[in-house]
């Protein structure tokens, strides 16, 4: 099936889904959140997903990231169908190929910036010294070489988000999934964070899928898809 859909080969999508559905139970009711989503993300592509609150944007991102399972349909990451994989294999594939950035940074408060950023490498099996070296390099790239020993509570909002971006990119993933990464920041800091994401995307050739309410930001992406009532209704 993956071969028929063009999931393999050097030009294959980094991330793709076919006929994706997600339904939740709310008491006696079945609530359809996503209905028949098809998507293919090319290597190095920047994509925005927009839509009103409750349209299914974050749910879609969770499914694409293998953090939740669809009610129906399939997600392919790096050519592998996620539904056929064990939890261990899914976790390994996520760690190797995906980075996650959220509106709220989700940094571990008891660890320093360096320790937070080194975590994905350690989980992926790197020796502590190598994970630390990679973390130091990416923190320098995001302009935080002098803040590596600070804990999240000692950093500004913009600095915390830069640490989160460094953590997402430290393993050089093939795709970044960003859920409102600038939504909790003032306009000046939000612009700096978007520019940083774009610069690192260009430097590493990483694909970027960003959920956002910011129409101006979305217009700067390669492609924008609009979700309404669980379906894509517009592409531009």
From Swiss-Prot:
SUPFAM superfamilies: P-loop containing nucleoside triphosphate hydrolases (SSF52540)
Keyword set, alphabetical order: ATP-binding, Cell inner membrane, Cell membrane, Membrane, Nucleotide-binding, Translocase, Transport
Gene3D superfamilies recorded: P-loop containing nucleotide triphosphate hydrolases
UniProt key word Cytoplasm: no
Subcellular location: Cell inner membrane
Membrane topology: Peripheral membrane protein
Intrachain S-S bonds: none
GO terms under cellular component: plasma membrane
Gene Ontology BP, a term: protein localization to outer membrane
This enzyme's EC code(s): 7.6.2.-
One matching Pfam family: ABC_tran
GO molecular function, one term: ATP binding
Primary location recorded for the protein, binned into one broad class: membrane
Job description of the protein: Part of the ABC transporter complex LolCDE involved in the translocation of mature outer membrane-directed lipoproteins, from the inner membrane to the periplasmic chaperone, LolA. Responsible for the formation of the LolA-lipoprotein complex in an ATP-dependent manner.
Record family assignment: Belongs to the ABC transporter superfamily. Lipoprotein translocase (TC 3.A.1.125) family.
Protein name according to UniProt: Lipoprotein-releasing system ATP-binding protein LolD
Species this chain originates from: Alkalilimnicola ehrlichii (strain ATCC BAA-1101 / DSM 17681 / MLHE-1)
Gene field: lolD
